[in-house]
Amino acid sequence: MEGVTLAHKQTGREHEISCAGLFCFIGARPATAWLGDSVLLDSDGFILTDRQLIGTLGAETARALPFETSRLGVFAAGDVRHGSMKRVAAAVGEGSSAVRSVHERLAKET
């Protein structure tokens, strides 16, 4: 890699930058504003799950499964979760692990 060409989304104007590498930080800022106060977030807007809820919900925390949020039956995984690694492979792994917790929660509810 020798460089990149950046294009302004609105004007189309291009700007070239010499560089030896490019690092994408998708997920560096969580897009959680739409959640409102439906689940607990940290001060940066990342979703709190399972162990991070200790002391915030009392007895409810003991019931939280891995990747479960402050709202029973609602799960979060990947970059949007507080304490996640912010890497694609880790997010994929968390997603598949969260599915197991979803199945466990559904089994408890039926």
Question: Which role fits each region the language model picked out?
Answer:
Residues 1-61, 104-110:
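A Rossmann-like FAD-binding core segment of flavoenzymes
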